[in-house]
Amino acid sequence: MATEYGDDDGGLYFHSTQMQSIHESLQQEENQRLYLQTSIKKLESFKHVNNDSSNNSNSGAVSVVQIKKKAATKKRKLMARKPNVKKPKSSSEAVRQAFEKDKFAYFTNNQAKIDDFLPGKSTSTEPSTSNQGSLISSDEWNYIKQIYLQKPTKNKTTLKSIRKRIKQYENSGTGMWEIAALNVDVSLNDEDIQHLYALDEEQMVSDDNSSTEDDTDPTQNDGLILTLSQNCSTQRDICHHEKDDQKYILIDSSICETYQQDKSLQRHSQKDSDNGNTIPDQNSAITIGEMESTAAHEVEEIFSTPSYVPSNKLNADQDRSDESESSIIMLADNIVSTQPDIVESISDSESEIEIIERPRLQVLRSVYENGTSTNQTRQELTMPKCLENNKISENEEYESEVVESDSTPIITPVVTPTKKPHIFPTNEPAIPIALRSTPNKIKNNVDRIFGSPSPIKLVLESPLKKHINIEFSDSESIYSTAVSQFGTPKQTTSFSPEVLTQKVGSPPLDACSDSGPTGVVSSMPYKKPHSTKRLRTTTLEISAALRVKNYTDPKNNITVKKFGEEIKREFIDLDNEIPDSESSDDDTGFSIIEITRQVEECKEPANDDYSEEQSTDLFQIGLKNKQETGNTSHMQVPSSPELQFENAGNTFLNSSLVEEDEFTKLKATELRERFKDWGLKPVQRKDKMLEILQGISDFISPESLLALKGFDLQQCVFDKLELLIKQDQFWYDRILTFEPIRLEELKQWLNSHNHHLELDILRLYCDRNCITTTNT
């Protein structure tokens, strides 16, 4: 039984293990199949599927539901809304908007409206061409002209009113103008004139006192200028009539004045002649031949600008104007044109040079077309007689000088009319050399300068320039482009010292003599020599136990500087010796100082090596012999707790101790007032205030703390802090790179240099100088 039971237990175990292994394999296959299905589904999104295959595939509809966000509710404002009411439009604005709309919409797709509009537009342009036939003929105008000039000036109507009447008669039908133009030989009687000009009986009886009212300008009485012309379309219409029927009239203000003063003139007197019709006033009568060109039957201009007449020929031309038959009538007597005379531009062909001495004036002028006559008249105007008389004598005294001028023609678009004043001689002395180039001095010697369009060159000559002979040596070049004004080594004549000292601020010229060689005088001012200061610097090596501070004595010109931090000496233990425990750390360190002082100048030759008696250094320490010291300037000074000097003026090293007793004498209230005056934050206890003041006095020594008032104390502290930071490259680089600085680290760094300042002072310094700080 036992064997069977044992066999049975072994068979069950075997079968159970087989079943377990089969189950695990099936479960693994199932997991693998599920993994493949999920991976295939993920990769189906990247598969390229056709439209046919996509339709056959049973893909489920995917619905995307958007999550609704809760709308943020705005807080309502308790304000009354403004009613959106537009401004009422006026009727004119409504009509304007209606007419400003697109007008072409009326004609779109409607040919009938276009056809109706175009004929009316074409007929509106016809009257412009039809007006040409309504012009007055020459016969009608001649008849109107005769009647117009026979009437007195006060009773005349202007051309504007006549044209207005003509238009009225044309609109009404046939009027008096057509009736009057039928027969030219028939003259109008009083009744015709009364009907023609619409005059009443009073105006017909009293010619002098009556006046007609028409729309004329208020400046009519100043003078009437009338231009009689016809706007003919072609030249053929101008030559249509004969020469005897054409008349041209010029009326001036002078004619109107004489015509008003003549009371004996008859209104209806008229004379006709075959050669030409004339006007009763003889002063205003102009014949046809005077206003017409004899070469061709063409109308010339009536009004033209009169030509310029020179002043010397004005009287002769006025006499000849009366004798000539076809001359133009002058507007008034003694009228001279303001236009400049016609002058040719300067050219290379013909030019005349005039030389006038004292002052010398060189004038280049062009020649008139008439030759010598115009040149003689211009010479009479420009050159006075006194200059002509003295011309020979001055040529002998002064040497002549001719300056070549540029022959380029000068073209000016507009030449202003100027008068030509005379140049009067002056009795002033010659201008010195130093003042020749100043324009103000030239104006004083030359009163007036010619106003002619030709260019003027002014050349002034001084008597200092005469009889100067310059000899050149072999080394000097005879073709030099410049010669000194103040003399050369081989110059025979020397200038007076007055001329030289006017322009050059140099030393006296007594040293320069004619016998010895003289050099060119410099134009720079003479500089006085200044004495320079001689400073001597001594470098000393001092033990760390000796406390030395920077000091400056401006009175005695002494400066003491301390370089860098204290340097520790390296202890070399060769035999593994244990250092003495009694020796202090102060004995192992040292510092370097530099003393600068001023050395008095000595007439004896300078000696770089000086003895102990000549030295004025602060540290009266005997120097070694020259053989022992050599070129070294460093000395080892034994350490001592504190230096004590015999001189009272050199107590700057312990200046804080002097003020400590003065601080202790002050009361707490007085110390608080001092703190407020200095801009410091006051504290409660007196001991704390004394500690702060002691640290500040040690920091800014040798300045006296009690002598500072206001913000001077802060400025002294800030200046000393800035100097210390610039000497330390680490802190200086951090500040320049705007790196945030912890005030605790800055305070510890100052404490390592035996400077004790509070955090409030450091924070105020950083805020004042824009230095970034941090508390972390």
Curated annotation (Swiss-Prot):
Q: Which UniProt keywords apply?
A: DNA damage, DNA recombination, DNA repair, Nucleus, Phosphoprotein
Region annotation (Disordered) maps to: 201-223, 263-283, 507-531
Processing after translation:
Phosphorylated in response to DNA damage.
Homology family: Belongs to the SLX4 family.
Coiled coil recorded as keyword: no
Localisation = Nucleus
Q: Which InterPro entries match?
A: Slx4_ascomycetes, Structure-sp_endonuc_su_Slx4
GO molecular function annotations of the record: 5'-flap endonuclease activity
Query: What HAMAP family is this protein classified in?
Result: Endonuc_su_Slx4
Q: Which GO terms describe its biological process?
A: DNA recombination; DNA repair; DNA replication
Query: Tell me, what does this protein do in biology?
Result: Regulatory subunit of the SLX1-SLX4 structure-specific endonuclease that resolves DNA secondary structures generated during DNA repair and recombination. Has endonuclease activity towards branched DNA substrates, introducing single-strand cuts in duplex DNA close to junctions with ss-DNA.
Q: What is this protein called?
A: Structure-specific endonuclease subunit SLX4
Can you list the GO cellular component terms from the UniProt entry?
Answer: Slx1-Slx4 complex
Q: How does it assemble?
A: Forms a heterodimer with SLX1.
Tell me the leader sequence span. none
Q: Where is the composition biased (Acidic residues)?
A: 201-217
